[in-house]
Swiss-Prot record:
Region spans: V2: 150-189
Gene symbol of the encoding locus: env
Transmembrane segments: 674-694
Keywords: AIDS, Apoptosis, Clathrin-mediated endocytosis of virus by host, Cleavage on pair of basic residues, Coiled coil, Disulfide bond, Fusion of virus membrane with host endosomal membrane, Fusion of virus membrane with host membrane, Glycoprotein, Host cell membrane, Host endosome, Host membrane, Host-virus interaction, Lipoprotein, Membrane, Palmitate, Signal, Transmembrane, Transmembrane helix, Viral attachment to host cell, Viral envelope protein, Viral immunoevasion, Viral penetration into host cytoplasm, Virion, Virus endocytosis by host, Virus entry into host cell
Segments for region (Disordered): 708-731
GO cellular component terms, semicolon-separated: host cell endosome membrane; host cell plasma membrane; membrane; viral envelope; virion membrane
Site (Cleavage) residue list: 500-501
Gene3D superfamilies reported in the protein's UniProt record: 1.10.287.210, Human immunodeficiency virus 1, Gp160, envelope glycoprotein, Single helix bin
Lineage: Viruses, Riboviria, Pararnavirae, Artverviricota, Revtraviricetes
Post-translational modification as stated in the protein's UniProt record: Highly glycosylated by host. The high number of glycan on the protein is reffered to as 'glycan shield' because it contributes to hide protein sequence from adaptive immune system. Palmitoylation of the transmembrane protein and of Env polyprotein (prior to its proteolytic cleavage) is essential for their association with host cell membrane lipid rafts. Palmitoylation is therefore required for envelope trafficking to classical lipid rafts, but not for viral replication.
Organism: Human immunodeficiency virus type 1 group M subtype H (isolate 90CF056) (HIV-1)
Record's protein name: Envelope glycoprotein gp160
A single BP term in Gene Ontology: fusion of virus membrane with host endosome membrane
Note: Inhibitors targeting HIV-1 viral envelope proteins are used as antiretroviral drugs. Attachment of virions to the cell surface via non-specific interactions and CD4 binding can be blocked by inhibitors that include cyanovirin-N, cyclotriazadisulfonamide analogs, PRO 2000, TNX 355 and PRO 542. In addition, BMS 806 can block CD4-induced conformational changes. Env interactions with the coreceptor molecules can be targeted by CCR5 antagonists including SCH-D, maraviroc (UK 427857) and aplaviroc (GW 873140), and the CXCR4 antagonist AMD 070. HIV-1 lineages are divided in three main groups, M (for Major), O (for Outlier), and N (for New, or Non-M, Non-O). The vast majority of strains found worldwide belong to the group M. Group O seems to be endemic to and largely confined to Cameroon and neighboring countries in West Central Africa, where these viruses represent a small minority of HIV-1 strains. The group N is represented by a limited number of isolates from Cameroonian persons. The group M is further subdivided in 9 clades or subtypes (A to D, F to H, J and K).
Segments on the Extracellular side according to the record's topology features: 29-673
Region (MPER): 651-672
Length: 845
């Protein structure tokens, strides 16, 4: 009985404990939460566009780099340093280099398209040496000077007429025909189509800033001793690179950027003779190049609208072009280069020798000076041997203050080492001089034994990618991934309609500054981080339209214009993709969006504190990147189900407020309902009248009018008031029907209302009695089940007790028997000596 009294309390406490366990287990559930504007990026290849301050340069000439089509440079460039971020860079696998190389070639070709083709000049040239006024020249051209005077026939304005003209050509631009000493042709006539550069085209390098479109960013390594490959610990993000001058040169890098602390050696493999070595200097070396000849330029008409520009005459003596470099500065720089090379080569002997041969562009230091293409012999620069920790020794015994490099000039240039394309550079009038800074070297190492004590380096080049690589080594392009997914304890509870705001994008400069912070710290600043993507797209479009408007007379878009259009389309596509995903997930206009998708521990089983307090968004993204598509799919399925539920819920939205019933827009509907009710009542009145008439006709009455009296019941206590007054009183009396339309309607409404009331009351009473009966029966059934459960519980308990008692008794009886047997055996063992003694005693007796 005591146990029976404790059953209700046990059930009560058990239910309470079970509920608490369910609540606690539900509280530990994690749900997927979407974050927009997180500092996450991935390496990408994208179309970059250019920015340039073209107004600061001469505007009369058309620059070959077409920087007028670039957007203006930002007067306040932003650079956001990312704390606690380590990023991997690889200058040898940088798509920015390939893109710049392709752009420069395309710009070069595009600038030559409208220029004059020099096919009519592929004729026989009768050439003689040009003599100085003060000295005699040799009789043969091979031994003569750099210039030769050639006469040839060209077609005039009239195609059937020819005239003989003459012009000065450089020796490098003509070759003899059949080893004839007087008859020559232009060097490229048998291999290339020669195009003359337009007279007003300038080759002056203008700094070009490469910029990333909206949705992308450029990461910059700020380590002062960074060698171009590996991890960088000082990383910042920029929108555009620094101004890069597209200087086309070989062997020596001109007017580039300098190293900050020490000379930097950059190479893919320093012992591989097929790989170029890029040396970035710390201190620039001045180089001054001069063409001392005072040339005049003449124009030769090749036909209608076509003119060929050539050197007409030279005023004064013919002197060779040359470049001057300070010997002291060069030797000091070379000593620093040797020191850094010795670190990579274990302090062995290092020698510098001239280039071993090849194309003239590679064999010499080639560059453009004021429109003339110079090819300078650098044997005077690279002819020395260096011992580690010893003084400098050189084969050059000259003690001149400057090193003079003899230079030759070519007008027919085969740019980019491509077959089939050549350019004729028109001569420049007057003296030419250009002052540049040597900021880097391109070297190659001779093939040899790795155990050799002497390493030989030679100047190299020819692949312009190395020129661009020397400036772009510290940059890489990344794609911003502003959508982040992480587990939280918050779940989307309510289903309600959202007022969807206009979504804002992520600022790749602002929010990447929080890249090194933990996820919890970075998520606090999402509002600041997600504001400038769309505005960046609009600003880029504005800049592009401004540039096109300024050059609207040019119907042909430049390479830069096309790239800007591509960049903008790409940015818009990325923005729309992110907004589409947010819309599909029901997160439009939200920076932090909770969802109804439970977090699966197989994606990540880390705790909340491990995720939000110890991990960055980049680390977290790498961990769950394999499950991103699956999570996206679940978010879409969840939102689809929620929208379906929302649609069902909104079907009842019209009942949300009773005041909407009085909206004037509903009045026509109310009038329609009133007319339908009145029409129905009239129809019912007619039907009832017809049925009443038919019923009375069947009973023998003949209705004369609608005023026929109908029986009206009255009480038995009311006697007949007049006339006959005797006999048995009738139970009914007749009353007249009402007169008029409104009384008829009112009477019918009253009768219909009373009938409906009585019918509904009867139905309600039936329902109440049924529910009461069901409730009583249900309560009795539950009570019976409870009693039955108690009875069987008690029976089970009694059976268990009986079983336990029986088991205990059986065990006790068995144990007692075993104990008795053990005792008897033990006593028998104890009595053995006594029995033996008694046996001996009996035997003795």
């Amino acid at each position: 009985m005591e146990t029976q009294r404790n059953y209700p309390s046990l059930w009560r406490w058990g239910t309470l404990i079970l509920g608490m366990l369910l609540i606690c287990s539900a509280a530990q559930n994690l749900w997927v939460t979407v974050y927009y504007g997180v500092p996450v990026w991935k390496e990408a290849k994208t179309t970059l566009f250019c920015a340039s301050d073209a107004k600061a340069y001469e505007t009369e000439k058309h620059n070959v780099w077409a920087t007028h089509a670039c957007v203006p440079t930002d007067p306040n460039p932003q650079e956001m340093v990312m704390e606690n971020v380590t990023e991997s860079f690889n200058m040898w696998e940088n798509n920015m280099v390939e893109q710049m190389h392709t752009d420069i070639i395309s710009l070069w070709d595009q600038s030559l398209k409208p220029c004059v083709k020099l096919t009519p000049l592929c004729v026989t040239l009768n050439c003689t040496n040009v003599r100085n006024n003060t000295s005699n020249s040799t009789s043969s051209m091979e031994a003569g000077g750099e210039l030769t005077n050639c006469s040839f026939n060209v077609t005039t304005v009239l195609r059937d007429k020819q005239q003989k003209v003459h012009a000065l050509f450089y020796r490098l631009d003509v070759v003899p025909i059949d080893n004839n000493s007087t008859q020559y042709r232009l060097i490229n006539c048998n291999t290339s189509v020669i195009t003359q550069a337009c007279p007003k085209v300038s080759f002056e390098p203008i700094p070009i800033h490469y910029c990333a479109p909206a949705g992308f960013a450029i990461l910059k390594c700020n380590n002062k001793t960074f060698n171009g490959t590996g991890l960088c610990t000082n990383v910042s993000t920029v929108q555009c690179t620094h101004g890069i001058r597209p200087v086309v040169s070989t062997q020596l890098l001109l007017n580039g950027s300098l190293a900050e602390e020490q000379i930097i050696i950059r190479t893919k493999n320093i012992s591989d003779n097929t790989k170029n070595i890029i040396v970035q200097l710390k201190t620039p070396v001045n180089i001054t190049c001069t063409r001392p000849n005072n040339n005049t330029r003449t124009s030769i008409h090749l036909g209608p609208g076509r003119a060929f520009y050539a050197t007409g005459d030279i005023i004064g003596d013919i002197r060779q072009a040359h470049c001057n470099i300070s010997r002291t500065d060069w030797n000091k720089t070379l000593h620093q280069v040797v020191t850094q090379l010795g670190i990579h080569l274990n302090n062995r002997t290092i020698s510098f020798k001239p280039n071993s041969g090849g194309d003239m562009e590679v064999r010499t230091h080639s560059f453009n000076c004021r429109g003339e293409f110079f090819y300078c012999n650098t044997s005077g620069l690279f002819n020395s041997s260096w011992e580690m920790h010893t003084n400098y020794t050189s084969n050059d015994t000259k003690g001149n203050e400057n090193i003079t490099l003899p230079c030759r000039i070519k007008q027919i240039v085969n740019m980019w080492q491509r077959v089939g394309r050549a350019m004729y550079a028109p001569p420049i009038q007057g003296n030419i001089m250009c002052v540049s800074n040597i900021t880097g070297l391109i070297l190659t190492i001779d093939e040899g034994n790795a155990s050799a004590e002497n390493y030989t380096f030679r100047p190299g080049g020819g692949d312009m990618r190395d020129n661009w690589r020397s400036e772009l080594y510290k940059y890489k392009v990344v794609k911003i991934e502003p959508l982040g997914i992480a587990p939280t304890k918050t779940r989307r509870r309510v289903v309600e309609r959202e007022k969807r705001a206009v979504g804002m994008g992520a600022s790749f400069l602002g929010f990447l500054g929080a890249a090194g912070s933990t996820m919890g710290a970075a998520s606090i600043t999402l509002t600041v981080q997600a504001r400038q993507l769309l505005s960046g797209i609009v600003q880029q479009q504005s800049n592009l339209l401004r540039a096109i408007q300024a050059r609207q007379h040019m119907l042909q878009l430049t390479v830069w214009g096309i790239k800007q259009l591509q960049a903008r389309v790409l940015a818009v596509e990325r923005y729309l993709r992110d907004q589409q995903l947010l819309g599909i997930w029901g997160c439009s206009g939200k920076l932090i969006c909770t969802t109804n998708v439970p977090w699966n521990s197989s994606w990540s089983n880390k705790s909340q504190s491990e995720i939000w307090d110890n991990m960055t968004w980049m680390e977290w993204d790498k961990q769950i990147s394999n499950y991103t598509e699956e999570i996206y799919r679940l978010l879409e399925v969840s939102q689809t189900q929620q929208e379906k539920n929302e649609q069902d819920l909104l079907a009842l939205d019209k009942w949300a407020s009773l005041w909407t019933w009085f909206d004037i827009s509903h009045w026509l509907w109310y009038i329609k309902i009133f007319i339908m009710i009145v029409g129905g009542l009239i129809g019912l009145r007619i039907i009832f009248a017809v049925l009443s008439i038919v019923n009375r006709v069947r009973q023998g009455y003949s209705p004369l009018s609608f005023q026929t009296l109908v029986p009206n019941p009255r009480g038995p206590d009311r006697p007949e008031g007049t006339e006959e007054g005797g006999g048995e009183q009738d139970r009914d009396r007749s009353v007249r029907l009402v007169n008029g339309f409104l009384p008829v309607v009112w009477d019918d409404l009253r009768s219909l209302s009373l009938f409906s009331y009585r019918l509904l009351r009867d139905l309600l009473l039936i329902v109440v009695r049924t529910v009461e009966l069901l409730g009583r029966r249900g309560r009795e059934a539950l009570k019976y089940l409870w009693n039955l459960l108690q009875y069987w519980g008690q029976e089970l308990k009694n059976s268990a007790i009986d079983l336990l008692n029986t088991t205990a008794i059986a065990v006790a009886e068995g144990t007692d028997g075993i104990i008795v047997i053990v005792q008897r055996a033990w006593r028998a063992i104890l009595h053995i000596p006594r029995r033996i003694r008694q046996g001996f005693e009996r035997s003795l007796l």
